[in-house]
């Protein structure tokens, strides 16, 4: 009972110390409000309102159909220019795409020739250029084929494709961006808050006070883990309900309570990583440098940004030892696909095992650090 009381009292002390740290409070608020909203809306993964210009040298019915096929929300209204204005517009960054339809284009198409339509792409706008190139090719090909056939799909295919989008029928970026921002920020804040809590003790000289108190390194470490973990757990829950479901109107398919249980297991592992990094760093700038080395690989290689199957096999095997890989897997299964505990229990069990390993390593390192200070 005495040990539990010490853990509780030390945890309350950590919460009071956090309330006095205005920078950390601002980071918490930003991470689960502005960051979530911007990740969902500012940088869409699909093509959105791309500026496009067309130099129509043919002035035919077919060229008009092609021009009218570029419409919102994928493209802005095409700007009609001359061929001489094309290079200047691309150089000035006014257009991402500039299409040059040659003279006699319709006549050559109907005659069975193969006229060339020049599509110039500003590749400095990487996301739009990569996605829009395929869009434009499909649009032009579709309009030419339908013009030749006089109407679309006049031939009956032997096989009819029935395409249904599961879990995100309208392919909305908000569904993916908002949830992944919360997942990434949970990991980031768990490491930052626990690591900074330990460094704050060292910088303020209160670590020496703890050394003369009847508390063990285990109790000190557990207090930091439960207090900082509780903060991340509460604010992530509020962000999921108020920001994602409320402001962004993103539907959550599964149980939020089950997801929060997964968050708690993930926090057990990531807060232990934060404690370990706090013992290595001697100041907040050093902790920030360590964060770059640790956090970026955890976020980029966990399967949230890029499917794990697209990574080299060695990277996949290494990342299986990291908690973020399993956390992303269970979070996507619960929040996107409505998975129940019977489906995600392997990830829960793996997170618990990985958390126990990281906790043990961090505790041994923390005891060694405390012993050197004594």
Regions found by a protein language model. Give the residues of each.
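Membrane-interfacial helix-loop-helix junctions in multi-pass membrane proteins
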Residues: 84, 167-171, 251, 302-358
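Short, membrane-interfacial amphipathic segments enriched in basic
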Residues: 1-11, 76, 314-325, 374
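Transmembrane helix segments
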Residues: 37-47, 281-321
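Junction motif at the cytosolic side of a transmembrane helix
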Residues: 2, 199, 276, 335, ...
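Extracytoplasmic/periplasmic domains immediately adjacent to an N-terminal transmembrane anchor
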Residues: 1-175, 343, 368
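Transmembrane helix boundary and interhelical loop/hinge segments in multi-pass membrane proteins
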Residues: 192-213, 225, 370
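Long, hydrophobic alpha-helical segments
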Residues: 174, 178-195
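Alpha-helical transmembrane segments and their short interhelical loops
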Residues: 33-36, 217-291, 296-299, 342-348, ...
């Amino acid at each position: 009972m005495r040990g539990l009381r010490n853990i509780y009292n030390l945890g309350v002390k950590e919460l009071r110390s956090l309330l006095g740290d205005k920078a950390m409070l601002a980071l918490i608020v930003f991470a689960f409000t502005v960051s979530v909203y911007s990740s969902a809306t500012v940088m869409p993964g699909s093509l959105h309102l791309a500026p496009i210009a067309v130099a129509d040298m043919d002035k035919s019915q077919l060229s008009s159909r092609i021009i009218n096929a570029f419409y919102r929300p994928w493209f802005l209204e095409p700007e009609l220019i001359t061929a001489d204005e094309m290079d200047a517009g691309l150089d000035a960054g006014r257009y991402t795409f500039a299409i040059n339809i040659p003279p006699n284009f319709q006549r050559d198409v109907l005659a069975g020739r193969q006229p060339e339509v020049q599509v110039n792409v500003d590749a400095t706008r990487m996301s739009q250029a990569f996605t829009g190139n395929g869009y434009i090719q499909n649009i032009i090909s579709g309009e030419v084929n339908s013009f030749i056939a006089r109407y679309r799909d006049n031939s009956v295919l032997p096989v009819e494709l029935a395409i249904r989008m599961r879990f995100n029928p309208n392919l909305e970026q908000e569904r993916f961006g908002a949830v992944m921002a919360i997942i990434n920020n949970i990991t980031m804040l768990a490491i930052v808050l626990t690591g900074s809590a330990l460094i704050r003790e060292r910088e303020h000289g209160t670590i020496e006070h703890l050394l003369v108190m009847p508390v063990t390194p285990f109790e000190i470490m557990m207090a930091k883990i439960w207090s900082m973990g509780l903060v991340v757990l509460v604010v992530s829950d509020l962000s999921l309900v108020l920001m994602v479901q409320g402001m962004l109107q993103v539907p959550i398919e599964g149980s939020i309570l089950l997801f929060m249980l997964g968050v708690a297991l993930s926090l057990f592992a990531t807060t232990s990583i934060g404690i370990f990094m706090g013992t290595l760093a001697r100041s907040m700038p050093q902790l920030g440098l360590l964060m770059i080395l640790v956090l970026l690989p955890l976020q980029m290689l966990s399967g949230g940004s890029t499917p794990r199957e697209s990574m080299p096999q060695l990277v996949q095997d290494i990342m299986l030892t990291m908690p973020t890989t399993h956390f992303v897997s269970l979070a996507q299964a619960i929040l996107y696909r409505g998975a129940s505990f019977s489906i995600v229990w392997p990830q829960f069990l793996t997170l618990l095992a990985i958390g126990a390993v990281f906790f043990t390593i961090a505790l041994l390192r923390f005891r060694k650090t405390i012993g050197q200070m004594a």
